[in-house]
């Protein structure tokens, strides 16, 4: 591969990982604010809301992990 295509590959991987990280940070921030809002409204449901919060947070956080895996695969396997 020539230098231009390798440079484009590096940029593509960096953009993929960066956007995934930004998206996860925004998603978890919104999720956390809604969790705190729900606990403030219904303090009796704290344990139920906390369980649902952690399940959904794991799902939101899974997408960037997949993107990092794909980015590293593109980076090291395409060469």
Swiss-Prot record:
Quaternary assembly: F-type ATPases have 2 components, F(1) - the catalytic core - and F(0) - the membrane proton channel. F(1) has five subunits: alpha(3), beta(3), gamma(1), delta(1), epsilon(1). F(0) has three main subunits: a(1), b(2) and c(10-14). The alpha and beta chains form an alternating ring which encloses part of the gamma chain. F(1) is attached to F(0) by a central stalk formed by the gamma and epsilon chains, while a peripheral stalk is formed by the delta and b chains.
SUPFAM superfamilies: F1F0 ATP synthase subunit C
Family the entry assigns: Belongs to the ATPase C chain family.
Keyword Transmembrane set for record: yes
Gene Ontology cellular-component terms listed: plasma membrane; proton-transporting ATP synthase complex; proton-transporting two-sector ATPase complex, proton-transporting domain
Chain coiled-coil ranges: none
UniProt cross-references to InterPro entries, sorted A to Z: ATP_synth_csu_bac/chlpt, ATP_synth_F0_csu, ATP_synth_F0_csu_DDCD_BS, ATP_synth_F0_csu_sf, ATPase_proteolipid_c-like_dom, F/V-ATP_Csub_sf
Pfam families: ATP-synt_C
Described function: F(1)F(0) ATP synthase produces ATP from ADP in the presence of a proton or sodium gradient. F-type ATPases consist of two structural domains, F(1) containing the extramembraneous catalytic core and F(0) containing the membrane proton channel, linked together by a central stalk and a peripheral stalk. During catalysis, ATP synthesis in the catalytic domain of F(1) is coupled via a rotary mechanism of the central stalk subunits to proton translocation. Key component of the F(0) channel; it plays a direct role in translocation across the membrane. A homomeric c-ring of between 10-14 subunits forms the central stalk rotor element with the F(1) delta and epsilon subunits.
GO molecular function, one term: proton-transporting ATP synthase activity, rotational mechanism
Main subcellular location of this protein, as a coarse class: membrane
Keywords for the protein's UniProt record, in alphabetical order: ATP synthesis, Cell membrane, CF(0), Hydrogen ion transport, Ion transport, Lipid-binding, Membrane, Transmembrane, Transmembrane helix, Transport
Keyword Cell division: no
Subcellular location: Cell membrane
Bilayer-spanning residue ranges: 11-31, 59-79
Domain of life of the source: Bacteria
UniProt-recorded name of the protein: ATP synthase subunit c
Residues under site feature: Reversibly protonated during proton transport: 61
Membrane topology value: Multi-pass membrane protein
């Amino acid at each position: 591969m020539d230098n231009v295509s390798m440079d484009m590959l590096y940029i593509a991987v960096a953009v993929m990982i960066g956007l995934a990280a930004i998206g996860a940070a925004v998603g978890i921030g919104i999720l956390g604010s809604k969790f705190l809002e729900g606990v403030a409204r219904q303090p009796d449901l704290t344990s139920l809301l906390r369980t649902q919060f952690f399940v959904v947070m794991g799902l939101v956080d899974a997408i960037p992990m997949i993107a990092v895996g794909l980015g590293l695969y593109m980076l090291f396997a395409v060469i």
